[in-house]
Every structure is written in structure tokens, then in C-alpha cells.
A protein has these predicted regions:
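C-terminal helical cap(s) of enzyme catalytic domains, especially alpha/beta-barrels
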Residues: 60, 162-173, 226-248
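Conserved, mostly hydrophobic/aromatic
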Residues: 6, 32, 43, 81, ...
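Catalytic cores of alpha/beta
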Residues: 75-84, 135-145, 196, 200-214
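Histidine/lysine/aspartate-rich catalytic loop segments that bind and position anionic ligands
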Residues: 127-186
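Conserved N-terminal beta1-alpha1 strand-loop-helix module at the mouth
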Residues: 1-75, 82-86, 172
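Hydrophobic faces of well-ordered beta-strands that scaffold small-molecule active sites
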Residues: 2-8, 40-42, 67-71, 89-91, ...
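Glycine-rich, proline-tolerant flexible connector loops at the mouths of alpha/beta enzymes
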Residues: 16, 38-63, 93-106, 154-170, ...
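Short beta-strand/loop segments at the ligand-binding rim of alpha/beta enzyme cores
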Residues: 1-4, 61-69, 117-130, 183-196
């Protein structure tokens, strides 16, 4: 069964808007877990725009659920990850001016550095994941650096889905799904785990969840947005139900 990792960054975004102490991301993680989340994802950015260092420490100490730490491949973040020991560390690109992660990590262009980072994380007992675009050269590079997981960037698919009025049969949407499917097959053929995420929501998640071999989906903004109206626990339950309905078994 496909797992759901719930990204709670935007709970912290709301808190940081007032530089106060609520809403508490740790409480959000507990609610997500009670709603059926299989893991919690947080992105500790270099600029600390939402999740803070104390958030990740408290999550590690207080929430008994798999933790996925999104991070840039910097010395500071590697040191934090090795001390924190999340179950998984996902290497992502970062830009100071971006609103959210805009593209996949260029693993092929930074192999030497990323191979060193992956080795350090492995020495600390941390599984390494890379967030990449659905490109063959990036999948191949991920395998060469020793990554255990590839999260395929679903943003281009999500944008096409929205632009085409949520028409799953439109040529643009079908083409983007095919790219994700083919990248996922390549990931699995190279012995890595195939995850997917970015800009997935309640309307577009099922075509991705139905792809063969998807192990885990990471979804945040859509779930946090819906939680304003139905509560976080129920928002997670609804997403899990959609994934379960669409998922196909795989070996």
C-alpha cells in the first residue's frame, strides 16, 4: 500500500506570520498521525522561513512516526541531520527568492558533492532521498551517488492538470503522467525506491497514486489548506482514502 507523508511546513508558516508560538507543528504532526499519516515531512530551510531548529528537535523527541527531513546539501544541514537522525533525509534544491521548491535537484551536475553527503548520512544510519525531475540522466545520477530513494517531482504534471481544467485525458496531462511513470520504472530498475510529490492535491492525486511501483507520496499544502475547514485529522483521512482508492498493488 502506498504510504502518505504529510508535510507540515505551512503550519509553521502560519505561526511565523506572527512570530508567535501557535499553531504548533508538533501538534499538527500528532493530528496527521491520528488521521492516518505514515510519516511527517518538514523542510528545514537555510533561511528558516517556516520550520525552526527547535521544531525538528521536538518532532524527533515527541512524535513516534517516521520523519523525513527535507534539506539542502550544505555542511550545516548535514550536521543537523546526523545529530537528529531522521528516518530519511531528502536532498532538495533551495533558492532564497523562491516561494516553494521550484524544480528538482540537479544530481547529475553535482555528483561529487552529493555522493559525499549521501555517504555521511549513511554513516549516521540515515536513508538518503533525492528530489529530482523526471529525467533519465537525473535518475541514473541518483543511483551513482548511492541514493536509496528518488522522489519524482510532480509539479509539472500538477500544473498541466490545473491548466487543462482537471482533464485527466488531455494530451498535456497524459504526457506528464507518462514522464513520471517512466522515471519511476527507471528508479525501481536501478534498485531505488520510487516516491513522488509536489503540488499534489485532492483533485490530481489519483493518477499519480495509480502508477505502478509508487511507494510514498508527500503532500503538504493541499492537506493543510483543507484542514482549515475540516480539521487536520479529517483532511489526512480524506487524502488517504483517495490514495487507497486509486492505488494498484505492486511487487
Amino acid at each position: 500500500m502506498i504510504e502518505l507523508g504529510v508535510n507540515i511546513d505551512h503550519v509553521a508558516t502560519l505561526r511565523q506570520a506572527r512570530r508567535t508560538y501557535e499553531p504548533d507543528p508538533v501538534w499538527a504532526a500528532v493530528e496527521a498521525h491520528l488521521g492516518g499519516a505514515d510519516g511527517i515531512t518538514v523542510h528545514l530551510r537555510e533561511d528558516r522561513r517556516h520550520i525552526q531548529d527547535h521544531d525538528v528537535r521536538r518532532l524527533r523527541e515527541l512524535v513516534h512516526i517516521k520523519l523525513n527531513l527535507e534539506m539542502a546539501a550544505t555542511d550545516e544541514m548535514v550536521e543537523i541531520a546526523c545529530a537528529l537522525k531522521p528516518e530519511m533525509a531528502m536532498l532538495v534544491p533551495e533558492g532564497r527568492e523562491e516561494i516553494t521548491t521550484e524544480s528538482g535537484l540537479d544530481v547529475a551536475g553535482k555528483e561529487a558533492r552529493l555522493k559525499s553527503v549521501v555517504a555521511k548520512l549513511a554513516d549516521a544510519g540515515i536513508m538518503s532521498s533525492v528530489f529530482i525531475d523526471a529525467l533519465p540522466e537525473q535518475v541514473d545520477a541518483a543511483a551513482r551517488i548511492g541514493a536509496k530513494v528518488c522522489e519524482i517531482h510532480t509539479g509539472p504534471y500538477a500544473h498541466a492538470f490545473h491548466a487543462k481544467g482537471r482533464d485527466r485525458e488531455s494530451a498535456a496531462v497524459v504526457a506528464e503522467i507518462a514522464k513520471i511513470r517512466d522515471a519511476g520504472a527507471a528508479v525501481r530498475a536501478l534498485g531505488m525506491r520510487f516516491n513522488a510529490g509536489h503540488a499534489l492535491n485532492y483533485f490530481n492525486v489519483q493518477p499519480v497514486a495509480s502508477l505502478p511501483g509508487v511507494g510514498e507520496l508527500h503532500i503538504g499544502h493541499a492537506i493543510v489548506s483543507r484542514s482549515l475547514f475540516v480539521g487536520l485529522r479529517e483532511a489526512v483521512r480524506q487524502m488517504k482514502a483517495l490514495i487507497r482508492e486509486a492505488a494498484v498493488p505492486f511487487d
